[in-house]
């Protein structure tokens, strides 16, 4: 799995000569040339079906998308993410199995950070912005805690930026 954050540096190596007069193939450059906190990170998307499933009823689904169905309270999908800095936006694509409001809670590092709400069976993306969390390896968990038996939550993928 991707760590989700990296410091990227560029090093030029010249072998057997001076660098005046231009480069003649002794250097290599990558797409990102700055490092540290000024690096631009384009985000990370994790498919829910690739996460670890938990709870009594959570299962993989293939319709309306390849993802996970969270059928009852404490059904979840989770994985470990390394965070190099402590604030991100979390976007979850999902839907309800019907017209009832499905609710999926976001936990990071064991702390509830917010709830995604899906009011219909058409897949949609919703974002919880500026989520603060711990650094290093943290469990990211999507879990149902407010099931009343009238809806199921379907989750497709989670994007972190």
Residue ranges of model-derived segments:
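Extracytoplasmic
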Residues: 1-161
